[in-house]
A protein has these predicted regions:
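Histidine/acidic residue-rich metal-binding segments in metalloenzymes
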Residues: 1-23, 33-184, 193-212, 228-238
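Active-site-proximal segments of catalytic enzyme domains
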Residues: 187-191, 195, 218-219
Length: 239
């Protein structure tokens, strides 16, 4: 899905320490016309449960983290829905899709996001050190196995529910089974606005971080649903 492609790019930045001078290949998701994309898909979302759930969790917190920027507020003013409408929709969708997991413990949207922020870590660390958890000790012993230099990492690793969820993500059969369950849903107008918003925020983030986008018109056309060169996503990035 388009949201999944945008999330994957943000994961590269956060988990692989991208910075000024680094480059993305193609980066089609950044420049695609969101309305045209969902029209082509007949306003249908097709994914697996796990990926769609991750998209919802990421979109919610990605928007929350950048909502106070003037450029973002200005962009939202041109959408059909307010930031409150969009965030409320994502909260409802989180509660709905969470039912697929059927956990016997209450995990919040924030717990899932904190677990998501541990994705760059070696999961074995959380099995080895979970009893008597001490972040400074783990950081000292496992510097090459955890993403400790990410400014949001410590709060996530110190959240016991986030650690539990991260262990489940890798080792729980019930959790992993959702990767093989097909999710089909409607791309509503408010969901489309949410995707437009995260696309804009990610473009702004990449621009401010001075990360480059490599593009080749012929290959871009072949790997996307675009038929005309004039509609290439690369051109949208230069607008």
């Amino acid at each position: 899905t388009l949201a999944n492609g945008l999330r994957a790019m943000d994961e590269v930045i956060e988990f692989l320490d991208y910075g000024s001078g680094d480059r993305f290949g193609h980066g089609l998701a950044l420049g695609l016309n969101v309305d045209a994309y969902f029209k082509k898909k007949r306003y249908t979302i097709v994914s697996n449960v796990e990926e769609y759930f991750d998209d919802i969790v990421w979109m919610y917190h990605f928007i929350r983290a950048h909502i106070d920027r003037l450029e973002v507020k200005d962009f939202i003013s041109g959408l059909s829905y307010t930031e409150y409408d969009i965030l409320s929709m994502l909260e409802r969708e989180f509660d709905r899709v969470k039912g697929y997991y059927n956990f016997d413990k209450l995990y919040t949207l924030y717990d899932f996001y904190e677990a998501y922020k541990l994705r760059g870590d070696d999961p074995e660390v959380y099995l080895e050190y979970n009893d008597g958890w001490n972040y400074d000790k783990v950081k000292f012993c496992c510097q090459t196995r955890i993403n400790w230099h990410n400014p949001e990492h410590q709060s996530a690793a110190n959240n016991p529910k986030a650690r539990e969820l991260y262990i489940k993500y890798h080792y729980c059969d019930k959790y992993k089974a959702n990767h093989f369950k097909t999710f089909t849903g409607e791309a509503s107008s408010i969901f489309i606005d949410a995707v437009k918003l995260v696309q804009f925020i990610l473009r702004l983030k990449i621009y401010r971080m001075e990360i480059g986008i490599e593009g080749n018109p012929t290959s871009n056309r072949k790997i996307s649903f675009i038929n005309k060169y004039i509609d290439l996503p690369l051109l949208e990035l230069n607008s």
